[in-house]
Amino acid sequence: YLAERGVDPVMFNTYGSRRGNHEVMARGGFANIKLKNLLAEGKSGGWTRDFETGEITSIFDASQSYAAAGVPLVVLAGKMYGSGSSRDWAAKAPLLLGVRAVIAESFERIHRSNLVGMGILPLQFHEGENAETLGLDGTETFVIEPVDFGTGEPSMPNPREVNVSASKQDGETVKFHAIVRVDTPTEGAYMAHGGILQYVLRQLA
């Protein structure tokens, strides 16, 4: 992206130095070279399969394809999703890529909170369940039951569970309950408004 705009490679610098440029940071989402996406057929790094075309492509390019088709995205993850050096862009980039929910075995504490701040729904498998035990491989189409966070005031109790169904390409449907990891009434208010920024702006209006 930078090279196409005439930036010399020696001037690329780090993602941290480009954190004010959402175009760069969105492309940096899930770009760690050690990332292992089981949809990428063994390729490490920021790759995935674009089910609109069937091709293995960059996560950013696939996200643009899904956005054009009006398809919101779900991340299936394992334990302690979001672990590592805490960065706000770890939640901002998935939002820009079209991620609307993350279903994981567990979450790193700060990252879970940051997901809520971005309006991304964190869902947790029940103890003893995960993508493998449920037979999920990421090729499914997911339907998450609408979660009612009330009027958007930080006084309503949050729903504790939600029904999820995953339809496989062969027609089989896997249904399970997920724990809603929106842990406080204030977080519920953020989710009701679509994120913390929208919540704050509406409080000022």
Tell me the role of every PLM-derived stretch.
Residues 1-205:
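Fe-S-dependent hydro-lyases/dehydratases of central metabolism
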